[in-house]
């Protein structure tokens, strides 16, 4: 890669790190395996005011754009693709966290989340499985930020 581009990336990463160095939300988010400083900063910047969701995860998921679109016809309800409403950067950050967790399979292989992902991948395909995992991670993040608690890997273990 071009040296100037690498230098520019490094400068931008340092600026981001300086901006969020005292941010409690970023530190909480970095306790999740697969979440780096850029992902944590992105998620924290878009979720500063969780009170606007009134403790309702469904509203939070709709804000991110990871809920299925709904098509009604008389008494039939069809669920379609995710809505993709909301900030694309935030949705991308959550998907990147999901992909990071999948990559960390040595550390996360016995987690229910990853087991559910693998099962859903064989049943429905990788795209749907990643979105399902993303939604579960978003729920974890929502609860963590609401309760001001770090990530607890003990809660993820299969029983």
Mark where each language-model region is:
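Short, contiguous, pocket-lining structural segments
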Residues: 1-4, 31-35
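Extended, structured, electrostatic nucleic-acid-contact surfaces
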Residues: 10-34, 43-46
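Charged, solvent-exposed faces of alpha-helical coiled-coils
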Residues: 1-4, 8, 15
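Low-complexity, acidic/Ser/Thr- and charged residue-rich accessory regions of DNA metabolism proteins
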Residues: 75, 115-159
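A residue-level signal for conserved active-site and pocket-lining positions in enzyme catalytic cores
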Residues: 5, 94, 137
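Phosphate-backbone recognition surface of nucleic-acid-processing proteins
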Residues: 28-31, 37, 41-122, 126
